[in-house]
């Protein structure tokens, strides 16, 4: 196991722990995994069931890019998690769901939470939290959410969680480093997803399908065909009135059939 990656039995939230460590100057690539969390959370503060038996990992990231580009980190990390699972022969049915989930068979397999902050010297950093259901599948379905599924439901032979942790950890750090290098080689006004845009869209769920965009409060914002996600991370929907784009803080998507 990499010396930068620490595994503990239980903590409140690995993201909270590393946000504090990051403020104290923890370096790029500092990783913390837990067997269980008592206060795990996802996007918009939703509770993340973090019982034992699943992959729970957070990583301090200090990519050498304009922090305004940090909005690309969730997509880059999601692709990296897919790559790590693919190396273990586990990714055949897994797709990315905009903006930050892993899904399979219409169920939620995992999620990614990226939180940006500044350390005590004013330097920017981010913490990327990754949760993947492996052996334990939460039974509770959040309002407007998808039911859960685990890697053990998709595959007969799932490696030990520590093996998966190592693969995911190294994949994410390597992917972020490569993304930062490529982003710095592009035009200054390029979108944060520019270096991985084609790859990201190719792995997205529901592209070309009819979807509904809903606000955080559950109100319908638009319905139409999910065309793509642009290089700035906005979901683009072709509606009867024309193309509309939504930032991840504005909306979430669901298939129209639901």
Tell where the protein language model's regions lie, with residue ranges:
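N-terminal lobe of the biotin/lipoate ligase/transferase fold
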Residues: 1-91, 108-110, 115-118, 256-257
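Long, positively charged amphipathic alpha-helical accessory segments at protein N-termini or as interdomain linkers
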Residues: 71-93, 104-258
